[in-house]
Amino acid sequence: MRRLGSVQQKIPCVFLTEVRDEPSRKRDCQQFQVVATENVSPAALASDVHCAAATEKVDGTCCYVTTFNGEPYLWARLDRKPTKQADKRFKKYQYSQKTCKGFVWNVNEDFREVPEFWMAAHRVQHENGHPVPDEHGHIPGWVPVDHTNKQYCWHSSVVNYGTGVALVLKTHGEDEGQLEIVSVPLADLMEQTLELIGTNVNGNPYGLGSKKHPVHVLVPHGVLRIRNPPAVEFQQICSWFQECQEGRVEGIVWHCDDGMLIKIHRHHLGLKWPVADTFLNTRPVVVHVDESDADPCASEKDLFKSFSSVNRQTFSSVRDIQFEP
């Protein structure tokens, strides 16, 4: 399978969108809703979205693998966001104008400080050598995941820098009907973006692990192909989400041949998410994590140790993975 596009900016909706005067279903305290119209966006058409590879949009937090201090490293998504005052001005403008276009930022004063090693995502535009915000008022970027930073403890649980590996959920070989959790060298994931999912991420829509035994894994973007995707047409996509088992997902991301990524989220269509019995949980999963991938000095709650204890075992779904008490 060819490596699909990496997420280095906010992904645009496949349809043109409009702003409605109703509370957001996605963001608390946002008094307007961004919804899809029935018109496919010109950008999607220009990238030939009808011929693109359709993949499952996974609900987690975005990560990136690239070098840090000369070694392959996991980086966490951290958008540089406006100050409260600047954000208030931006939202007021967006609400009154029904668009973000035309709003003027003062990049030097309107944005919060970021950690020392923060870097802007690759596709962020620059003016006068400085990264500038996207249409949502954010500057997408990354920070390296350090084991000493408790803010990123769930990120760090899926990487072992000592052995240079990460815990990855993907399809099992050529069998897209089965999943596997495997330890993958970070060097093999270089310049890829992945989604961290699990017990303590985004409300855990897939039901992984428990408070006693949290479970987190990385899912490479584009790895979960949609075998029978709907045509890129408003009503067909709505029906697919509501009527097909394969449609019990957060959304679709189309990977176009020119590298462009296009998405649709259930919220764009006024549909509920999360849903019961997600499609991710309809497939069995086999574990391939060897004891040598774990740090011998780590605690018994170390994820690599936990997964190595069930090495070569198959579970009916990712939410059914259980470790010995």
UniProtKB/Swiss-Prot annotation:
GO molecular function: ATP binding; RNA ligase (ATP) activity
GO annotation terms (biological process): response to reactive oxygen species; RNA repair
Protein origin, superkingdom: Eukaryota
Swiss-Prot/TrEMBL keywords: ATP-binding, Ligase, Nucleotide-binding, RNA repair
Cofactors required: Mg(2+); Mn(2+)
This enzyme's EC code(s): 6.5.1.3
EC category: ligase
Modification(s) after translation: AMPylates itself (auto-AMPylation).
Coiled-coil residues: none
Pfam families: RLIG1
Function: Functions as an RNA ligase, in vitro. The ligation reaction entails three nucleotidyl transfer steps. In the first step, the RNA ligase reacts with ATP in the absence of nucleic acid to form a covalent ligase-AMP intermediate and release pyrophosphate. In step 2, the ligase-AMP binds to the nucleic acid and transfers the adenylate to the 5'-PO4 terminus to form an adenylylated intermediate. In step 3, the RNA ligase directs the attack of the 3'-OH on the 5'-phosphoanhydride linkage, resulting in a repaired 3'-5' phosphodiester and release of AMP.
Name under which the protein is recorded: RNA ligase 1
Protein species of origin: Danio rerio (Zebrafish)
